[in-house]
Amino acid sequence: MKFILLFLILTLLSFSCRENKTVNQDRMIDLDDSSKKETIKAENNTHLQNYIKYLATLKETDITSIPKAINYFDSGFDNIDNRIFDKLFAEFNNFYEKVMNYQKNQFSEFEYNEQLKIYEAMFDITSQTEDWIAPNDNQKNYAVFLKENGLNLCNIEGNIYVCADYVYSFEKLKDKISLPIEQYLIQLQSESEELYTSDAGIIVPLETIANRIVFWENFIKDNKDFIYINEASKLFTEYKKAFFYGMENTPVFDIETKTLNQEFKDGYNFII
């Protein structure tokens, strides 16, 4: 239910900001006007180079570098062509992942119970068991610290780790990024909330994987020049392999009966 609600919220947010994209869409039309093309191209290149220089002044080991990197776009970017802004987003995202990976490594050094309490604090999880202990102030503050600086915690079958908060980026930049980037972020957030594999096995219904295959197939077809087309293609390929070939602990065929396992039979019927 949490996954469904989050997806709906993100989708509504996406629709709500379409009207605000009018300026950017007009700016895209300007790029096709030869009399303005070179001027706009030079202007946008300056934006990109200035941002790259700015990122070089920020520390990848400092989590507060994330809001600094994204708040750079608070002013002076209202009329920039959103295809060019997507390149700026790519620079931000690359930097974001470096900071996230550092924080992930730091978090992995905590004892498991410490990780669990921080996770419980972030998502306000409680328990009625007698021996349950509520997160302390330090754990609560750490959870807030991560969230306020654009990072999230994921818990996959008890494995807790620092992960991306795509809602953070989307909310901050929704009026500037292109529609494909919007769709890309929404889909990544949805999939990060429900990972499809663990321990060499498929842990979601085959229908879920089928829907992702359809989404990425259409997305790639409609956005051939997308800045993250390679990443989108990789996801598309991964889901197809899982769907049609299964995984070590989720085989397509039952060796003993020499027939399709029921979950794959249902999945194939669904996609047909």
For each feature predicted by the language model, list its residue ranges.
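Structural signature of alpha-solenoid helical repeat junctions
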Residues: T208-N211, I227-E231
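Short coil/linker segments at helix-helix boundaries
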Residues: N113, K117-I125, W132-P135, N141-Y142, ...
